[in-house]
Amino acid sequence: MATIHVDGKELEVDGADNLLQACLSLGLDIPYFCWHPALGSVGACRQCAVKQYTDENDKRGRIVMSCMTPATDGSWISIDDEEAKVFRASVVEWLMTNHPHDCPVCEEGGHCHLQDMTVMTGHNERRYRFTKRTHQNQDLGPFISHEMNRCIACYRCVRFYKDYAGGTDLGVFGAHDNVYFGRVEDGTLESEFSGNLTEVCPTGVFTDKTHSERYNRKWDMQFSPSICHGCSSGCNISPGERYGELRRIENRFNGSVNQYFLCDRGRFGYGYVNRKDRPRQPLLANGAKLSLDQALDKAAELLRGRNIVGIGSPRASLESNYALRELVGAEHFYSGIEAGELERIRLVLQVLKDSPLPVPNMRDIEDHDAVFVLGEDLTQTAARMALALRQSVKGKAEDMADAMRVQPWLDAAVKNIGQHALNPLFIASLAETKLDDVAEECVHAAPDDLARIGFAVAHALDASAPAVDGLDSEAAALAQRIADALLAAKRPLIIAGTSLGSKALIEAAANIAKALKLREKNGSISLIVPEANSLGLAMLGGESVDAALQAVIDGSADAIVVLENDLYTRTDKAKVDAALNAAKVLIVADHQKTATTDRAHLVLPAASFAEGDGTLVSQEGRAQRFFQVFDPQYLDASILVHEGWRWLHALRATLLDQPIDWTQLDHVTAAVASSSPQLAAIVDAAPSASFRIKGLKLAREPLRYSGRTAMRADISVHEPRTSQDNDTAFSFSMEGYSGSTEPRSQVPFAWSPGWNSPQAWNKFQDEVGGHLRAGDPGTRLIESQGDHLSWFASVPRAFNPAPGTWQVVPFHHLFGSEENSSKAAPVQERIPAAYVSLAKSEADRLGVNDGALLSLNVAGQTLRLPLRINEELGAGLVALPAGLAGIPPAIFGKTVDGLQEAAQ
């Protein structure tokens, strides 16, 4: 710690910070533009000027940039010095000379850091009367709008996009006061993190195009704290609603998880919530709509006297899955996950519980100094983790700078010192990945061969680990280099997962973790699972969807209740058809129209994450609560959407002729927690419904929320009472606490007086860029309890397919491989057409060129797909895009026994 003096006040700060960060952490206001907590300091904008004095006797002082000045012990500075204030006001005035002053029509208005800083400096009069510089805007794709005339040349966009996220297609062109931030030519931004430009940019240059179509100001939206359902990373989000529609998603700061950034799937994939074809009333097979009571009575009538199986879902909350389990009985509850995938997820859970190495949170990943990624294409399967890995490899430059006594926040200096030095990252994958550019070495091979390399690394680390027979010398040498790098590191990290359908990859990663612990290395292990609640569902229990379908086919059950799951995306279509044909009753509770709801005798309209509350467990083992954003019935009483757990508990009560005893979320969450010691801590994931600040509930709406009395005027001039939320500590209103002074971990939207942009998160943190003052949201359910793992000894044989056969492997796509986000119109523009991928050597052997139409026979099906030649894919492999339309879900791992150019 260091003692500094600010305008005569003696204050304690972190001496490792710069003055800007230190003062902001104290709650003092200094305007800034180019600095960002995640990007460090470059001193480009000159906006954060303060007066620095030699000591208490110095009356003259000198102007310094606070972001470039360390907060050394004994520093004397002034923020309120008149010369410093005039300097800051003049900087804003210079920046505004070419700004269009178009706040009333700018989509950033009311959400704009430039507005906040202009007001903060007191600049309120335009003196510039000359021609303004203008630019041509670019079409940057379906996610981002571009308005270059608003640019103040802070350089934040390129520093994030290129330096932080590793993007290559956004740059800065020109010189002096005529610079241009964009692409060489119009075109979709290629980075999977491009959406963060909308929050990183302090002005309205980059704005959310998906929000533009149905735009409203930030102060006119209703928000809630929520969790992204796009993958298993558990990123925190702030969804905003107006008129019963989800309008945009912003990043919600969680210092242990996503911090300031999201991937584009999580930010722009919300459109499925607004789809017109969603079930919003209970529906019979003939299309007849039912009231709530009629639906419950009909469901009970259909199920009475039946042998029921319940099929849950890894995209549904723990509460909803538990309610289904209570309805049908634990022995008749099935997870809704394909058998092989469920086996792998259970293995992940076992390894994480028994591993001698801890599971890192997302932020912690950035602090590891050697990483081995085994089998995962992280940018496509856990994109936010890939972004964290990019920061981990940069730790080498920070170490070099530290040796030269250069502070890590001096971004340009650290880059100059480090040049191209990176911490070692090794990637073993099917083919090239978006992280290959920062990897020390990459190897591309079949899943079994990748696993063999992993087992060999474990054996190289510790000779007691199972050896790999018949490993070629090149692979053995690579395994030794990886082992040496992991041993040389202070904090090595192993990452694997389920995406390639290989248990052996997970087992190899577990062996490496055990070997590292035996070598007394302070490392970590992280394992990726497919969906938002895959790990939570594995903790809850239940057999595979295949077992459920087989029970119906065999006649042991004749009724199926499906929760938020499209069975046709899980397993073989013929098997699903056979089970649904055999079932006398099919009831589906879902928020989407799917092939399964099309077969249902009764559809119960379930709530999406925006309309309901629940708990998810991320791949880290962090239980986190998502909260209802809006009440759809407030604007349309005919909508009968309810959380899955409400429908299923009410149905159970109707069947048993009992009263409903889960009347609020806390009741069902407590029931889930009491059902298993492993889930006992989920009650601590968020405050209960009784939580208050100064006697107030927490406001979902900003204080300036307008138009509430007019929103239903077309229905009735009599304004109804706002919806009452008995489930949570939040109110569907601006009435309630919305400030930043009282600590709270669940923050619907970031706002503080004078701070309307996302930079307002500064006011909620213990120190800027640190953690929330009340603690980061969520609670960990998995902590390392010592080494309880035995060596996994089933090393697979080397991949050697029979002549004329190929193994089907999955290529995952951030846009397209996840079911719900793929229903969002902007995301659909980024989804590739279905294809088949082969190695160049295989294409040459078949005599086909890129783009040729191929016919392949696999698992009794014939597919006709265009060819994409992949130079890095191994021989004997056929890669298909997982999750895309036209690609059967049960095809991966199967053998292709007929592959040829299709007859036109």
From Swiss-Prot:
Coiled coil: none annotated. GO terms for cellular component: membrane. It is an enzyme of class 7 (translocase). GO terms for molecular function: 2 iron, 2 sulfur cluster binding; 4 iron, 4 sulfur cluster binding; metal ion binding; NADH dehydrogenase (ubiquinone) activity; quinone binding. Residues 221-277 form the 4Fe-4S Mo/W bis-MGD-type domain. Binds 1 [2Fe-2S] cluster per subunit. Its cofactor is [2Fe-2S] cluster; [4Fe-4S] cluster. [4Fe-4S] cluster 2 binds at C151, C154, C157, C201. Residues 83-122 form the 4Fe-4S His(Cys)3-ligated-type domain. InterPro entries: 2Fe-2S_ferredoxin-like_sf (IPR036010), 2Fe-2S_ferredoxin-type (IPR001041), Asp_de-COase-like_dom_sf (IPR009010), Mopterin_OxRdtase (IPR006656), Mopterin_OxRdtase_4Fe-4S_dom (IPR006963), NADH_UbQ_OxRdtase_75kDa_su_CS (IPR000283), NADH_UbQ_OxRdtase_ferredoxin (IPR054351), NADH_UbQ_OxRdtase_Gsu (IPR010228). It catalyses: a quinone + NADH + 5 H(+)(in) = a quinol + NAD(+) + 4 H(+)(out). Keywords: 2Fe-2S, 4Fe-4S, Iron, Iron-sulfur, Metal-binding, NAD, Quinone, Translocase, Ubiquinone. [4Fe-4S] cluster 1 binds at H99, C103, C106, C112. SUPFAM superfamilies: 2Fe-2S ferredoxin-like, 4Fe-4S ferredoxins, ADC-like, Formate dehydrogenase/DMSO reductase, domains 1-3. It comes from the Bacteria. CDD domains: fer2, MopB_CT_NDH-1_NuoG2-N7, MopB_NDH-1_NuoG2-N7. Induction: By low oxygen growth conditions, especially in rhizosphere. Gene3D superfamilies: 3.10.20.740, 3.30.200.210, 3.40.50.740. Composed of 13 different subunits. Subunits NuoCD, E, F, and G constitute the peripheral sector of the complex. Belongs to the complex I 75 kDa subunit family. NDH-1 shuttles electrons from NADH, via FMN and iron-sulfur (Fe-S) centers, to quinones in the respiratory chain. The immediate electron acceptor for the enzyme in this species is believed to be ubiquinone. Couples the redox reaction to proton translocation (for every two electrons transferred, four hydrogen ions are translocated across the cytoplasmic membrane), and thus conserves the redox energy in a proton gradient. Required for plants roots colonization. This is NADH-quinone oxidoreductase subunit G. The gene is nuoG.
